[in-house]
């Protein structure tokens, strides 16, 4: 029997930089100083050619809040994990 569990993960990120693994189509919430500034569904992750180590996040809607891009953010997202039993 398979079941899906939602696991809350916290990933430190700067200027929307984040590891690309397993985030496409997931809803993520971006927090700064304890305030939710944007929560949306991630539709694409890209690594610019001029900066291979930098990951860009693209959402299905633009964030409506003003974000201090010089700060360090924590991105919290619900990742689905499957367990077989």
Regions found by a protein language model. Name each.
Residues 38-46:
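Short beta-strand-centered aromatic/proline hotspots
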Residues 45-65:
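Basic/aromatic-rich interaction segments and small domains that mediate binding to polyanionic partners
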Residues 31-39:
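Short coil-to-beta-strand transition motifs
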Residues 51-52, 78-85:
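Short acidic, Gly/Pro-enriched loop/turn segments at secondary-structure junctions
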Residues 67-81:
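Structured surface patches comprising rigid loops and adjacent beta-strands/short helices at the edges
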Residues 2-21:
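Mixed-charge, Lys/Arg-rich low-complexity intrinsically disordered regions
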């Amino acid at each position: 029997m398979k079941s899906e569990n939602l696991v809350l993960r916290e990933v430190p990120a700067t200027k929307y930089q984040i590891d690309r693994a397993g985030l496409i189509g997931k809803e993520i919430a971006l927090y700064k100083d304890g305030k939710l500034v944007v929560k949306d569904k991630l539709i694409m992750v890209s690594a610019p050619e001029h900066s291979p180590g930098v990951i860009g996040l693209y959402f299905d809607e633009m964030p409506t809040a003003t974000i201090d891009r010089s700060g360090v953010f924590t991105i919290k997202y619900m990742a689905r994990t499957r367990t077989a039993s």
